[in-house]
Amino acid sequence: MAGVRLGVSYKFLTVTVGSLFLLAACSEEAPQTTQVMESEAPMAAPVEPGLGINPRGKTELEIDMSRIHNPQIAEVFDYIDTNIDSHVENLQRWIQQPSVSNTGEGIQESAYMVEGFFDQLGCQETEVVDPGITEYGSQANPVVYAICDEGAEKTMAVYWMYDTMPITQPDLWLSPPFEARIVEQPPFDKVIIGRGANNSKGRQMSFWNAMMSIKAVAGSLPVNLIFLAEGDEERMSIGYRKFIRDNPDLFTEADVMWGGGSSEGSVFVELISSGEQWGRGPTYSNIHGGRKRQVDAPAWRHIKMLATLVDDTGNRVMIDGFYDDIVPLTEAEEAILMEAAEDFDVEVAAERLGVARFISDDPYEVQKMSRYGQSMNLDGIWAGNMFEGGSGAILPNRIVSKHNFRYVPNQTGPDIVNKLRAHLDKHGYEDVEINVVGDVPWAKMDDDNELSMAIREMRETFGAGNPEPIYEETILGGYWPAYLFAGDVYDIPIADGYVGGGGGAHAANEYFIIEGAGNTYGMAGMEKSIATAIYEYAGLNEEE
């Protein structure tokens, strides 16, 4: 497969993360990086066990080996089991490297760490690229591009995000969020707690470990890979969007994409009130809070403004026309939600999520809200004295609130922003500024492709069950920049699939399951499931 060279590389950067050492340069040809995780020699002796990980854990599910027709896959399974300690250590090192896109903490170092992963995998071309200034006026974070030409018949594009959310409640963590400590969390004997463990470093490292295991056993991968990793997913993929649109030839040779499937829409805005724009209250800076007796408060007015945007429950958006363009669910989508609701325990799900209860107690309604709901959230608000406890009289001159709108077909982000502007003007808030942080449109897709069918085969093999395939386009998926690959720039079949996982994304004590239990596989199971899906897609698990 032919390579695509990109435009801008970063200068020399040396990164030390735990036992990880990488060196990257600005030359056209990416330098070889120091081997840091697994031996170069195929089937080399594994590292001495240090963690005592049980690959199977207490998982009650069984892999149906009668469906594994290629003996090479069984060898890969054995390799994963033998090396699971080092695979978990790989994930720990990855979590220990902060990569917080909204603050910039560790972003540059993380980009080069990702490039090191791709170099380690044997990709012939790897590059860290600066997309430049985005359409929203912000500097993009680096993207990392790699081509792994295995001489295979099929080529798979692979989506990665290397950024995470910030740590917003450090006191609630059971262990430091960048320590990647292994702890017991019933029913699981071993999970890793850390920022990014579930979203999405655990899955990414499982994919990487699986590919490294295949290479160690077989010497090459069943498919060619084109990686493109972004550092802006938690910033609405603003840099990724620019980079993909600026480089429309990147994935022309890709047959499919390993990614998250369909996607809801999401637009983020900030609403900004100030005494200067209002013409009342403090104008230049905060003033003494005692002056409230004689001076208007922009902050109180902002709170009153927010109250006009939703109903008394906070669950229905009151912006005129907000719901006008929504397309009703199809019969196929209704059936999917009904099936998902059959085995859905509302109370258990709420407890695992860390909420007292859902808006509805009906399993079907909760599934529908989760996968086809619309909302306006208050993500954060700040002004004045933001120190918990104590005192300190402040009358703020400026207040900012951050909001995300989740939307579905045929709503659009720009239309929602326009309707928001009209609502504010109608209610006398012409001075309130709207700052659009970013917009990720929804994306529809179906299961009618070879990768989706391969994933279905894998799930049957792993006893994970399968919903009926969807042969009409839907958006029953969470937010990610799928739209870029579903008609905006490319039109590629997209799917991914694995067993195992974690929880607590964006929350304190985010975790990834290392040793499974009950009907849940651990990390070894996830790696095996990914390897199996890749072999199935490549047509290398056919029954003779």
Which residues fall in each region the model found?
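An extended, acidic, His-containing surface patch that forms the Zn2+-binding/catalytic region
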Residues: 318-398, 406-422, 427, 431-544
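N-terminal hydrophobic or amphipathic helices/low-complexity stretches enriched
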Residues: 31-106, 124
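Bacterial signal peptide processing site
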Residues: 27-29
